[in-house]
Amino acid sequence: DVCSSDLDWDYDAPESAGAPTPRDASAGAMMASALLELSGLVAEPAATKYRNFALDVLRSLASPAYAAKAGANSHFLLMHSTGHLPADTEIDAAINYADYYYLEALLRCRALAELPASQ
């Protein structure tokens, strides 16, 4: 249930000696929020493309692969963020700004759903 971009910490990072690239829910949450904002500022068909991709990412973040169960994960909403891979710190961690941008993106989704159909 993970989208095609699969939320890598860096989309251009080379694979390291057989080790998988760490996932980064925070990057996905930030991207989804930004794309939802951008979808309201550009013309069609780009608006729909950005909105649909953001919604795919949010569905992925809401899946059991990234969403923590209530009370788990030190009470953070999202699991599997990467803070600073080059320094080998905050790998597969819960990061507060991941939750912030996730909630921001969800609020933007709600605002889009509340728009009149003509917009």
Functional labels for PLM-detected ranges:
Residues 2-4:
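Short, small-residue-biased leader/transition segments that mark boundaries at the very start
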